[in-house]
Amino acid sequence: MKKQTVAFSRQSTNLFFHILTRCNLRCAHCYINREQHGSNTLSLDTIREWLGIFSSKAKDTNLIFLGGEPTLHPDLASAVSIAGAMGFKSITIDTNGFLFHNILDNITPAQLDFFSFSLDGVTKETNDAIRG
């Protein structure tokens, strides 16, 4: 099995798509926080419209779903399906990993190219302190 990761280089095009601001954690370093950003969630129609804007370059674009915590979005599975149908080069979900089982219940491995998990410390104590 060939090891792969999303290419973050001058030659690659990466679309970082924040589909909601809500999160299940309160990480000390996070730039998206409840006080500033509230709990906004894009509708599936809005997600489809935005993806449509970039669809002409989809075959050359790595799509990364972000948040907040994207696994909290009620239509994440549908958004992944829409992106797949548009032919994006790769589809990634960037997650804190706490709701990983929810992803596996709704999205098949064939629909997704990568998961990106954040780890915020080398010990449980450090990780938990940072994540609030």
Predicted regions and their residues:
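Canonical Radical SAM [4Fe-4S] cluster-binding loop centered on the CxxxCxxC motif
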Residues: 7-45, 58
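Generic intrinsically disordered, low-complexity segments enriched for polar/acidic and small residues
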Residues: 5, 13-14, 28, 62, ...
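Conserved alpha-helical segments that form or flank metal/cofactor-binding pockets of metalloenzymes
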Residues: 68
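Glycine-rich, flexible loop/turn motifs
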Residues: 4, 38, 126
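A detector for short, charged/polar N-terminal pre-domain segments
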Residues: 1-7
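Radical SAM/AdoMet-radical enzyme domain recognition
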Residues: 44-65, 73-132
